Amino acid sequence: MIKKYYFFLFIIGSIANAQVKILFDATKLQMAGSADWVIDADVHNLYTNNTITTTGTESNPQRVPTPAQSAITASTPESYWNGALSHWAIDCVRQGYTVETLPWNGRITYGDATNVQDLSNYKVFIVDEPNILFTATEKNAIVNFVKFGGGLMMIADHTISDRNNDGEDSLMIWNDMMTTNTVQNNPFGISFDAADISQTTTSVAILPTNQILHGPPSTITCNVCGNVTQAKWSNGTTMTLNTNANASVTGLIFKSGSSTSGITNVMCASATYQSGKVVAVGDSSIPDDGTGDPNDTLYDGYIADASGNHQKFLMNATIWLATNSTMNTHDFEATLSSLRIAPNPIANKNLKLYFSNSSNLESEFSIFDATGRLVKQFHLIDSNMQNGCQEINCQDLNSGLYFGKFQIGAAFKTISFSILN
């Protein structure tokens, strides 16, 4: 039997030692009105209306929170940083993650080497209640981020919650992204409802092995994770799921009295899409730790509401989004070694892959262009290997940015590369 090989390339470092980075978005007026959905702001000078200027009093979060996250310990209070999402962010740091903010004037891109905060540099992207529509480029960037292995946390709020008075609220903005991007219509199978609900619910899906509802596997230590038994919405919304659009989409928490295995009245949901993952939440205030911008009235939804279940849910979900779903570190290391691509960018349109593999698993390599369109797909077999190198002819591809998806068995990983003339 011909042995087929598959290889993995990594965007940042190795799987064993790569630092998981989490990016909290602040480009969509997450600090507008009475909200302060940021992790830390040293300055409060933003004016948030149809446009953003530095002539106001709202939080203006910087890229890197201060004081330094390297000094955070188990006893560090959430007031260490100044933002209503600081407790969540500090919990992420305690978990070993690095957190950053995409500031109000940052750019949401995927595969743009000119952007130091390009989404390809992060494992998880958290967007709590956007108040401005995503541009066409941003919509495609977010969907491609998930498609090629990223984890997206999309949080909405109740209908008519437009905090900057531009006619668009968060649920409309999320629905617009999912239906008008040009990568795939409704890729996640999730639609936010035009609803406004306030209630405490114990209608949690019966999914005993679900890591978002019951915490990460025993190989991952998390002191604030655990079983989720309830949630409290304080003017939030619900979702309707479409399993025809995405067969993986799953309701996790439902309105009180609703079926816990249905596709309507969903308050929290999750899905996978290609190589990535999504978690959707219908109330923007559940991460609110009650402190932040002194000009806002904030409430503790993270710990005080729902008997602490919101902290468990959000950290369970964050870890799930940040964790590779189909193969663990040991499996990667056991299957692949001495992996490299040289050169990158690719010269003469001849892609050279260097790797060693003792696996007999079926393998496949797919190339996508910058829009997410599949342009090449084939298997790697040992008869084509010479001195540990597999050469791939890319003469039929134009110069530009591409993404490679490498799959062995059920496991996969993606990386960006460039082709020069």
Label each residue range with its predicted role.
Residues 333-421:
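C-terminal outer-membrane/trafficking sorting elements
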Residues 25-28, 102-106, 127-131, 155-160, ...:
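Active-site-proximal beta-strand/loop segments in catalytic clefts of secreted hydrolases
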Residues 1-20, 329, 389-391, 412-414:
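Bacterial Sec-dependent N-terminal signal peptides
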Residues 18-122, 302-305, 315-323:
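Aromatic-Pro/Gly-enriched surface loop or interdomain linker
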Residues 19-28, 34-38, 218-325:
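A glycine-centered loop/beta-turn motif at secondary-structure junctions
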Residues 70-180:
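Helical hinge/lid and interdomain linker segments adjacent to catalytic or ligand-binding clefts
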